Amino acid sequence: MSNVPADLRYAKSHEWLKLEADGTATIGITDYAQSSLGDITYVQLPKVGAALKAGETFGVVESVKAASDLYAPAGGTVVAVNAELDSAPDAVNRAPYAEGWMLKLKLANPADANALLNAADYGKLLG
């Protein structure tokens, strides 16, 4: 069974979003996604300052099994990327909700997070 933290919001494309106290949102891929991909070998992320729209591709994650596009669960401006993933992409496998975070967004509309799935609904999606 995949780990689905209750304090996060989830996209059907298996990205998670955490609203932070400073109004930004931290984004990564779910435990289910990293488990399905297998050992992650490379993560391509956007540059700080990039503008993203909800549902738009923001990067790529490559594993021993496949390469998969990453989709923005909400729109906004990239204010930080996890540069540690350049040298340690396996952090996404080890801790997808902690050290394996991918980027931080200044949300264009914080209410966009409400359109995402809560933990219970995401759990149902996974079966």
Swiss-Prot record:
PROSITE patterns: BIOTINYL_LIPOYL (PS50968), LIPOYL (PS00189). SUPFAM superfamilies: Single hybrid motif. Binds 1 lipoyl cofactor covalently. Keywords: Lipoyl. The modification N6-lipoyllysine is found at residue 65. It comes from the Bacteria. Its cofactor is (R)-lipoate. One of its GO terms (biological process) is glycine decarboxylation via glycine cleavage system. Residues 24-106 form the Lipoyl-binding domain. InterPro entries: 2-oxoA_DH_lipoyl-BS, Biotin_lipoyl, GCV_H, GCV_H/Fam206, GCV_H_sub, Single_hybrid_motif. Pfam families: GCV_H (PF01597). One of its GO terms (cellular component) is glycine cleavage complex. The glycine cleavage system catalyzes the degradation of glycine. The H protein shuttles the methylamine group of glycine from the P protein to the T protein. Belongs to the GcvH family. The glycine cleavage system is composed of four proteins: P, T, L and H. This is Glycine cleavage system H protein. It comes from Opitutus terrae (strain DSM 11246 / JCM 15787 / PB90-1). The gene is gcvH.
